[in-house]
Amino acid sequence: MLGRKIPGSGVLGAGAGMDRGRTGERLHAALAGLQELHFLRDKQSAMVHWALTLNRDQPDPSKQENVSKEELRLEATLSLLKQQLTRLRRQDVGLKTHLQQLDQQITELKLDVCKASTEHLESDSRPSSGFYELSDGGSGSLSNSCTSVYSESLSSSSQTSLLPLLSTSYASHGRSSCGQTGVSRRCSADESTAQSDAPRSGVKLGSSLIRTATARADRARQRPVSTGDLDRMIGPGFGAFKSTDVKSSTPCSSPQNPSVDPKYQSNLVSSNGTEVYRYPSPLHAVALQSPIFSCTSDQGSSVALDEMPEEETQNLNEESTISSSVGYINKLLQRSSSRVNLLSSIKRIETVSGTHEQIPRSQEMIYGSLNGPQLLGSLQQLSMPLENALETGKTSALNNNQKQMDPPCLGSNFKEVEVQMLHHGKHPESSLDLQKNNFPINNTAGKVGAESDNGASEKRSGHFPKDLSVVQKPVERKSSFTSGREGSRASCHDKSSIPQSEFVHAQFVPAGSQRVKVRQADKKTKSVKLRKKSSEKPSAKKQHQKPLSREFCTKNRTDLKQSGSCRGKVTYLEESQAQSCSDCSCNGLINSHCIQNNHQQIPSSKSTKSRKAPEPVYHPLDHAKKKPSSRKWPSSSEIPLPPTLHTQRSKEMLNSRKVAMVRSVSARPRSGHWGCPPPRALPHSLSTSSYFSYLESRYPAAPVSSRHPPRCESEFSEYSAECASLFHSTIAASSDGEMSDYTTNRFGDSESSQGSQTASESDSSLSLDEEDLLEEEEEDEGGLVWAQAAMGTTAAGFSLQQHHRSESAACRIKASRALKKKIRRFQPASLKVMTLV
């Protein structure tokens, strides 16, 4: 009916013929798709049916197989038992002899141990190593351990001997699954377990654990199906589908569907190559029935349905992917090359139009943005010709100069510049600035290498000082960020030396004015008689010595202000003064004096001197001695002892002994109060101060009424003679110098305190004389020792103030036997020898 032509309509007949052909092709494609779907359905149903029958119908034959397998295992175990019995009989003979030898050795050892224990019971107390445990029978432990070790070796030997035998027995029965399949692959874990069940029972037998009932119970349970069984059993079932040709085994060969075009049994590939439908799949069948994949054979150029073999489709896919990747890479290369060309052209224009004014700014930019020496090394050769062109100002002849000097180097440099632009990535402008303005760095960093490489070194050597002077300004500006102190010192040197001299004088003034400042507080002191008596003799000396020190200070100041060539010396002195001031600043009072003298400087010291002229000089030491009587003891945290203090005080003691003065110069207790420990006990000064503070808290101070040192309240009690004899005997035997005077005066020995009364009356003046001698000796040394003298005087003043501040006015000691215990308990490290009687 469709093929019947309508009379009088030729055009319609031609169109109807074309439609008829198209519909016929669609129908054939739909038929092929339906047949493919039927084939897939049959294949899937066969797979499902096989899986169901595998789970349902297998138990009946498996029971029979299990029974036969159990019989075979029993036979194998019987044969193994026989073989093992023969081995055990052979091994028992050796075991018996070995055990007998061990028993003999154990008995011998036991006898030897018994003899040794009876003979050397008291002398030998070493712990035993634990190798021979003789506590539990002796012969039992070693024999048991030996049999256990031997049983383990026996079981291992039985394992190695039984495995090949079982494998041969299984091979003889024809139950080897690997041999059945004939596939040269390794057996899976389940196959190996299925074969090694009997050897495991043999192993159990080898280790004397024979179980026949449990083996049968294990065989009664069905082993689950695993991948090894599926691979072995499913392989032949599905091998028919895989091995047979799909085209020959399709239902198309049935008499109902005699003709099926083989072109519909190939893979479908779309025109753009993105979609591929493999033949035996439901998607392939559906795509055959759709009109999109219908074959338009009348239009030769446009073919919507491409029937190709698998190899051709794979090649087409590979070619499409390769072409797409190559096109993408080509696009990237074109973009990068165009960007590099554009940047290089801009770079050439900007390097021609660059001037000297851009150099300092670009120098800072380069310092901030340089990554490392690679950029310097790569742009070094390029920078020299550009720098020469900029120096001479002949911008028009830049290209000629570059070509004449080193054209290949320039070409390579431009390539390196392009590579660096690509390396910088998203910031080509910053890399352009680097490339444009890199010549100042290269002038400083790589000047020698660039001159040796290029030929016109004479011409450049004339221009280098200018560029270096231009470049050094930003370099100094940058170094001011990195090294701030050095830059500030350099700028101070360039400006003037006035602030340095003022700073030096401000640091130097506390050394001389500190005593003046302490002397100002003499009006508040109470012990006036002692101060007048003790200051009669040394006042003239001190007044004679003080103008010398003042002249020395003013002379140094004028020298520092006038001389401009000794700046390095001034800085060294400044550092030494700063060190001395920092050493003295650990004392709070001295630090406040330093701050005041920083602001007042010379006029303050003059005013204080004019204020104190009628009075005798240097009573502040006595004032400092009397002042701590009204305040509490400082704790150990309030008495810092810097290392310079130890050296200075030891130096004071050496100087005082050198002049043969009284030994209680600065460390022996003054009249009316007690001093710090002598310099020999400086490492233990913290412990002594804590000990004295403890005594002060236990026994409060008594008021001072005379210039004599206070004595114990219980001096005339019944135990005073005992205490005096105790301390005299210990001190005379174990101490010398200041230590004896200090301890006797400290613990209330009336005789020694009265004997040293004349010395203690003038000890203030002697301490001042000691300071004068120190200053004279240090001035004689010459050079830069005036700073050390300042440090010494401040340290000496600090030590004297520490003595008097850290001591109390009096200390009451109850003379009893508990005194010895307390002294022994709270004794400092320096008094251990004296109190341990």
Swiss-Prot record:
List the record's Gene Ontology CC terms alphabetically: cytoplasm; late endosome; nucleus; plasma membrane
Provide the residue span(s) of the region labelled Disordered: 189-265, 424-497, 512-564, 600-649, 738-782
Q: Which residues cross the membrane?
A: none
Species in which this protein is naturally found: Danio rerio
Q: Please state what the protein is called.
A: Dapper homolog 2
Family to which this protein belongs: Belongs to the dapper family.
Instruction: Spell out the subunit comment.
Output: Interacts with dvl2.
Instruction: List the top taxonomic levels of the source.
Output: Eukaryota, Metazoa, Chordata, Craniata, Vertebrata
GO BP annotations listed? mesoderm morphogenesis; negative regulation of nodal signaling pathway; Wnt signaling pathway
